[in-house]
């Protein structure tokens, strides 16, 4: 898989979690399967975890899991998006395309 395709997956994942305000892995996968990127194949937990680590490394965004009341993933440090104009612009412009 090309690096640009993986990067698009990071953007999609970040954007989906951010816009939802909290999302279960099941719901995330339901949305994922409906994208062209997925090819109709669900995202494995291993892939999700690798993407989650890469997103933190590249964008500085921490995707955490709220275990109480269900397992919901959310961006713990949303202020990074609000305070870092370059990262915000990049995520914004790439999530539109």
Stretch-by-stretch model annotation:
Residues 1-96:
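Short, basic/aromatic recognition patches that contact phosphate-bearing ligands
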């Amino acid at each position: 898989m090309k690096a640009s395709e993986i990067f698009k997956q990071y953007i999609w994942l970040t954007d989906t979690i951010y816009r939802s305000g909290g999302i279960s892995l099941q719901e995330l996968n339901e949305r994922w399967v409906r994208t062209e990127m997925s090819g109709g194949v669900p995202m494995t937990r291993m892939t999700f975890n690798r993407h989650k680590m890469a997103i933190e490394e590249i964008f500085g965004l921490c995707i955490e899991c709220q275990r109480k009341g269900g397992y919901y993933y959310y961006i713990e440090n949303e202020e990074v998006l609000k305070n870092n104009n370059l990262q915000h612009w990049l995520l914004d412009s790439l999530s539109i395309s």
